[in-house]
Amino acid sequence: MAEKILNNDVLTSLQKKNRKQIQVWLYSILLLCLAIVLVGGATRLTGSGLSITDWRPIHGVIPPIGAEQWQEEFLKYQQIAQYKLLNRDMTLNAFKVIFWWEWAHRILGRLVGLLALLGLIWFWATKRIEKNILLKLTIVPILIAFQGAIGWWMVASGIGQSNLTSVSQYRLAFHLITACFIITFVTYLSRGFTEYSEKPANQRVQRFAGWLVVLILIEIYFGALVAGLHAGKVYNTWPLMDGQFIPDGLMQHNPVWLNLFENPLTIQFIHRFFAYFLFFVTIIHAFYVQKNIPHSTHSRRAFFICVMIVVQAFLGIITLLREVPIGLGLIHQSVALAILCFSVVHWRATKEAYRAVE
């Protein structure tokens, strides 16, 4: 039997209550995902990501207890290249600090996975999920499980090699962009349950808002490559790089495409100039929305994105000039996530809420 699409003004009080509960569940997942990314950023900035050298999805929940277990964990760390080449003078107490960062990152990952899976099962078993959104909600725990596997795949890249003291920048960037995709997806889903006071925008505005989210994700991806190659700790001047607007050595690697992923100078250059490009696109977008839907909530959101981009650019410059201190690095990452989430909210709000299904 074909589904009948209804107008949302015919939603029953029970359907509205169910939607509100699902939305709260999705927002809880979103908050945990944001926390995981920030703890992951701290884990990276403190060099803690390789402190746990194995992956035990169940038993790994329990940290070392007592001096003997701590010493055993420390001995495992002493077998990898990061300890041998960088941290030979590390004490057990110093090891505990980096261990706790990585442990917290993994625990948060398990928590969000359980929240997503158990929440989905409960809403499905109690028949609170409408047919047209069941598949979308099912994708959430699948993506989170996939992200957990990517996380270990990333860590493994820095453990199995005798000459590597950090994880692969390719895998780090993939890990972060997958997390950002999950954040984008969950934000988009959760906002779809909101009844908007503003009418939907036209299709051109909707598409422009969607492409803006794509551009923000690209900028975050190159930011991850900057982090993976420690490119923020070189060429710490602005607006020039090494005394030049377009520095020498941008294409020094062969083949040329390798510079986009392995040349710190090129990657920092792209991250800088893509930020300028993104700023101009957000301005164009804001005026375009204002022209099409003047003095609307949509246009106000579009202009606020411009403000957020300016703040983020200022933070990026200060972080670069100060050679990426941990605090500023985390603030820069936090604002990037805020821009992403708000841009997704703006994009989703240009459309109508999920329609009721009979």
Curated annotation (Swiss-Prot):
Subcellular location field: Cell membrane
One term under GO cellular component: plasma membrane
Named cofactor requirement(s): heme b
Sequence positions that bind heme: 271, 332
Keywords: Cell membrane, Heme biosynthesis, Iron, Membrane, Metal-binding, Oxidoreductase, Transmembrane, Transmembrane helix
Annotated transmembrane regions: 22-42, 107-127, 139-159, 173-193, 208-228, 269-289, 302-322, 324-344
Main location: membrane
Keyword Membrane carried by entry: yes
Signal sequence coordinates: none
Molecular function in Gene Ontology: metal ion binding; oxidoreductase activity, acting on NAD(P)H, heme protein as acceptor
InterPro entries reported for this sequence: COX15/CtaA_fam, HemeA_Synthase_type2
Record membrane topology: Multi-pass membrane protein
Classification via PANTHER family: CYTOCHROME C OXIDASE ASSEMBLY PROTEIN COX15 (PTHR23289), CYTOCHROME C OXIDASE ASSEMBLY PROTEIN COX15 HOMOLOG (PTHR23289:SF2)
Self-association and partners: Interacts with CtaB.
Family: Belongs to the COX15/CtaA family. Type 2 subfamily.
Function, as annotated: Catalyzes the conversion of heme O to heme A by two successive hydroxylations of the methyl group at C8. The first hydroxylation forms heme I, the second hydroxylation results in an unstable dihydroxymethyl group, which spontaneously dehydrates, resulting in the formyl group of heme A.
Name of this protein: Heme A synthase
Organism the protein comes from: Bartonella quintana (strain Toulouse)
